[in-house]
């Protein structure tokens, strides 16, 4: 809603709830505290306004850039199969679906990558948007760095292939588009968005016991008492696994992108429809095979099952919870009832789910999970995009595609040949499984918050939206979702002040990089730093890797958005407010020989008020493609660190390359 309000301030009624579709590309390695529903913010100690504002401002900026660079163009759709990039992490739940239904599909996950290619009318590629069913959990829950994971890396790699001179994002203070001769401006945009990934994992080696390496119990995903069960990816560690999955997506995406013959041009009008739904009040009809009649079913108040606390094989949970749990525990029931005891009608509504958290009755200090969700359907020519408010499992997504396609076919007004499930749209309401998967009560079923008939309600809701679009009939907007921004709580302390290390200034280098490096080396530098929460640096960067050019200037070759760089912030003293930034650059195999330096940019909070920028740079170091010590052409920049310290030695105060700070 805040993004929409921002856009309406800029463009009036151009953007509305009807036509603005926000679907998370999704990652499990990003700052939390922005969801507003309490359950989703508990792990981050509540709502964090700085994180919320950073996301809102970033999304608004992206839409604004797109709006102000609108061009006439053409859209093409193509699709292909990606092998070895995903597995089903709840196969026992999937197997509970009807055998006749499962026989229709070759796999228990969707392997199809769908691509929309955007070209200008002159044939210039403008962008490519993809949907593929895989969780962005290659970076596991031991990771402490912000990462866009496998789908984010695939996006970056795609952009670099199409526009090899570009930098991800924009570095306004050192490398704006006037450096286009050296580095491109990055006008091409690639994205890999979420689809029906609810039960889909990128950790293709499958679940194993942590110590013994034995297979986990297939039903409960457990091992012996002293072992955890988790899945791992195809690489030697989570970083290499992320890259392997990303490159699999990239390879197929590039193949589709360059295959003009099998691409189909999308022609026709753009139509969108949107409606809010109060899920606990929603009803649907289901067929009862015993009575051979249809009966009415309804949604439930939100609730989480016991298996929710067990986590998944991508990220195991806490305590002794197990997946596929269908009974309650007296101890945890006491804890549950202290918060909010479920009523008999709640337990009956949730069916086979033993309730661990009756979130629908938890209203203090505000809502724990949403009851009113956004549903939206967009149609581009003969392509329909079902924007769903959660994570649909493989079979749930397949049923949704069939339902939407069937609704358009029944009305017979403009055929829809392709239906895409766009996950995590507008509202997040956890998972959506089939009724059969729900009854198994794996993690996904326990997290299907509106009960066993959630999917059936959504199927009939999206059928109604499809029928309304097909005949050109409007729908009522539905109930307004609650707004409780004034009641949000946060237990995260704000940044009180920063102070530099004694006898140093902000941006001063504490650890210099080695003098000479070669491909594969990891170059590390450490700086005196302020708190990164002082400024999210939208369109900017916390670090730069710069190369000395033949025309006597520094050109940025990498920022904090590049995969080969890493920015680590460390609070060295909580009371004094001192901190350091550790910047790492892994030298790529295609590095251009020459002289380089690493820069750090940030802002510090002055103890008597105000936030002020600073910057600092390392000494110059030489990169070569051969053994260390190989020479490279070009003049040597002046002003760099030229002391006699050994490589990697800590820099003493008032030595080396000094920082630039600003305070007025």
Identify what each model region corresponds to.
Residues 1-634, 639, 643, 663:
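Non-catalytic substrate/cofactor recognition surfaces at enzyme active-site rims
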């Amino acid at each position: 809603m805040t993004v929409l309000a921002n856009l309406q301030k800029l463009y009036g009624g151009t953007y509305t709830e009807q036509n603005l579709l926000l679907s998370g590309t999704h990652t499990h390695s990003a700052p939390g505290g922005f969801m507003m529903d309490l359950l989703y913010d508990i792990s981050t100690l509540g709502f964090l306004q700085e994180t919320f504002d950073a996301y809102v401002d970033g999304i608004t900026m992206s839409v604004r850039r797109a709006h102000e660079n609108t061009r006439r163009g053409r859209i093409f759709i193509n699709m292909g199969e990606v092998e070895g990039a995903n597995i089903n992490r709840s196969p026992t739940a999937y197997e509970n679906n009807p055998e006749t239904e499962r026989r229709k599909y070759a796999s228990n996950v969707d392997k199809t990558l769908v691509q929309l290619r955007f070209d200008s009318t002159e044939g210039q590629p403008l962008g490519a948007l993809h949907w593929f069913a895989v969780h962005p959990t290659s970076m596991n829950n031991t990771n402490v760095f912000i990462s866009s994971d496998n789908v984010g890396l695939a996006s970056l790699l795609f952009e670099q292939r199409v526009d090899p001179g570009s930098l991800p994002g924009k570095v306004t203070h050192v490398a704006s588009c006037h450096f286009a001769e050296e580095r491109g401006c990055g006008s091409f945009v690639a994205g890999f968005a979420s689809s029906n990934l609810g039960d889909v994992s990128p950790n293709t080696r499958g679940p194993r016991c942590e110590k013994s390496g034995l297979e986990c119990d297939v039903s409960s995903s457990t091992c012996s008492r002293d072992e955890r069960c988790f899945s791992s990816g195809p690489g030697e560690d989570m970083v290499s696994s992320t890259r392997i999955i990303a490159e699999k997506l990239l390879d197929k995406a590039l193949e589709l992108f360059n295959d003009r013959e099998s691409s189909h041009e999308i022609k026709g009008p753009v139509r969108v429809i949107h409606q809010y739904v109060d899920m606990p009040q929603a009803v649907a009809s289901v067929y009862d095979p015993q009575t051979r009649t249809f009966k009415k079913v309804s949604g439930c108040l939100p609730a989480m099952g016991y298996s929710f606390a067990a986590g998944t094989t991508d990220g195991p949970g806490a305590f002794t919870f197990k997946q596929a749990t269908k009974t309650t525990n007296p101890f945890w029931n006491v804890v549950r009832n202290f918060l909010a005891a479920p009523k008999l009608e709640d337990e009956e509504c949730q069916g086979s789910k033993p309730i661990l958290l009756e979130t629908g009755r938890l209203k203090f200090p505000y809502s724990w999970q949403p009851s009113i969700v956004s549903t939206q359907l967009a149609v581009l020519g003969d392509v329909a995009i079902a924007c769903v408010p959660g994570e649909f499992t493989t079979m749930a997504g397949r049923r949704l595609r069939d339902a939407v396609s069937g609704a358009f076919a029944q009305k017979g007004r403009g055929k829809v040949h392709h239906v895409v499930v766009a996950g995590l749209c507008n509202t997040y309401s956890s998972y959506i499984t089939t009724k059969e998967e729900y009854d198994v009560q794996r993690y996904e079923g326990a997290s299907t918050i509106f009960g066993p008939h959630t999917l059936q309600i959504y199927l009939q809701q999206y059928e109604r939206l499809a029928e309304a679009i097909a005949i050109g009939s409007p729908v009522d907007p539905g109930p307004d979702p609650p707004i409780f921004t004034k009641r949000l709580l946060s237990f995260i302390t704000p940044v009180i002040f920063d102070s530099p290390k004694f006898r140093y200034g902000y941006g001063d280098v504490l650890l210099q990089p080695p003098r000479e490096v070669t491909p594969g080396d990891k170059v590390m530098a450490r700086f005196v730093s302020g708190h990164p929460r002082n400024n999210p640096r939208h369109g900017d960067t916390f670090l730069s890797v710069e190369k000395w050019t033949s025309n006597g200037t520094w050109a940025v070759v990498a920022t904090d958005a590049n995969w080969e760089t890493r920015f680590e912030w460390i609070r060295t003293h909580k009371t004094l407010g001192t901190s350091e930034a550790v910047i790492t650059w892994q030298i790529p195999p295609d590095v251009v020989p020459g002289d380089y330096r690493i820069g750090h940019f940030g802002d510090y909070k002055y103890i008597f008020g105000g936030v002020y920028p600073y910057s600092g740079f390392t000494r110059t170091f030489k990169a070569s493609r051969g053994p260390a010590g190989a020479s490279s052409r070009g003049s040597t920049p002046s002003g760099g660190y030229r002391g006699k310290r050994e490589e990697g030695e800590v820099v003493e105060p008032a030595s080396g390359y000094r920082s630039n700070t600003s305070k007025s």
